[in-house]
Each structure stands twice: as C-alpha cells, then as structure tokens.
C-alpha cells in the first residue's frame, strides 16, 4: 500500500510539472504575439437563448450573472498580470459577450461574424460567418494578439475545440489550436 502511495505521489507531481511546462509555453507564446485568442463568454447560467431573443434587447437574452462578471474580471486580470499584448478585442453582438469584453478589456469592437448560430433561428448564418471570420483573420496583420470574445459554437467550428465558459483558446492564423487556459468561475 505504501508503495502505491509513493507511485501515486510521483505520478501526480510529474503530471503537474508537465502541465506547468505546457502553461509556461502557452504564456511565452501569448507574450510573443501574433495569435488568435478566442474567449468563450464568461459564465451565463442556462443554455441557448429564449424564443423572444432580440439582439438589441439584453432582457431577452441569456446574460452573465455575478459569477460570470467576476470571471470576466479574472480574465482581464490574467491578461494584465501576464503582460499579454493585444492589438484588438472583437466581440459577438450578444450581450453576454459584450459584457465579458467590456469587463475584461474595456475597449472592443463588435463583429457579427462572431455571433452565435446555436439556435435554429441563426443556424443558416454559420457558413457565411465562418467565411467572414477567416477573411478577417487573413487580413489581420497585427504583431500582438487578436482577442475574439464569442460563443461555444463559433470556437468549436473555428478550432475544433469545445471550450468551457470563460475559457481562453489560443490558435494560430490557420485556426490550429495551440493551447487553452481555463479561468475558474
């Protein structure tokens, strides 16, 4: 039994070293710039949006709660503390994305190609949005990082990865996932 405990302790410490090394590499890459940084909006309880959804009326949308707002602050703090250079922050027009961007970064621009296409109402927009996202990235020549605050479905489609709320997903300009960082809520 004692041998099993020793093996378990060694395994856990090696796992933590590997994880820390990977995280250090991710941070180094972020600090160099030239990355796409997708952020799934911070925690907003529930799933999807109500049937009466109106893009101009936040009361008809699923929104951040206090936990999501705190998570947004943690996202901003992560970028500041790690001195991650940013060219531009762009966001979906959905209120939960705008609020995440506003709290974490203050300044941002809205881009409709980052809007959700989760519901049947918006699913028809998926192909055009992905084309426009790729065109935008192709024309981006920033030396720092491009931050994209968006939705699960957009990130999943763009980089083939399923992010948690508030998760940071790093990709290159070819949308190859380079790493991810989870921000607790």
Briefly describe each language-model feature range.
Residues 82-84, 140-144:
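Glycine-rich phosphate-binding loop signature in dinucleotide/nucleotide-binding domains
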Residues 129-140:
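A short, acidic, amphipathic alpha-helical segment used as a generic capping/interface helix at domain edges
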Residues 21-112, 117-121, 161-185:
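Active-site-proximal alpha-helix that buttresses catalytic centers in soluble enzyme cores
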Residues 1-9:
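Sec-dependent signal peptide recognition
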Residues 34-36, 144-150:
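Generic beta-sheet signal
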Residues 16-20:
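Sec/Tat signal peptide C-region and signal peptidase I cleavage site
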Residues 125-127:
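Conserved nucleotide-cofactor-binding alpha/beta core module
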């Amino acid at each position: 039994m004692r041998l099993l405990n020793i093996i378990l302790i060694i395994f856990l410490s090696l796992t933590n070293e590997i994880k820390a090394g990977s995280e250090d590499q991710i941070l180094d890459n972020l600090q160099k710039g030239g990355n796409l940084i997708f952020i799934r909006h911070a925690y907003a309880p529930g799933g999807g949006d109500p049937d009466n959804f109106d893009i101009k009326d936040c009361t008809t949308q699923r929104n951040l709660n206090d936990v999501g707002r705190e998570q947004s602050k943690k996202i901003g703090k992560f970028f500041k503390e790690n001195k991650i250079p940013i060219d531009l922050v762009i966001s979906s027009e959905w209120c939960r994305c705008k609020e995440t961007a506003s709290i974490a970064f203050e300044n941002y621009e809205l881009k409709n190609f980052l809007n959700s296409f989760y519901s049947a109402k918006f699913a028809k927009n998926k192909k055009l949005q992905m084309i426009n996202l790729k065109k935008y990235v192709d024309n981006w020549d920033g030396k720092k990082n491009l931050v994209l605050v968006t939705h699960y479905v957009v990130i999943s489609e763009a980089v083939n990865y399923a992010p948690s709320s508030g998760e940071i997903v790093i990709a290159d300009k070819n949308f190859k996932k380079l790493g991810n960082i989870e921000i607790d809520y």
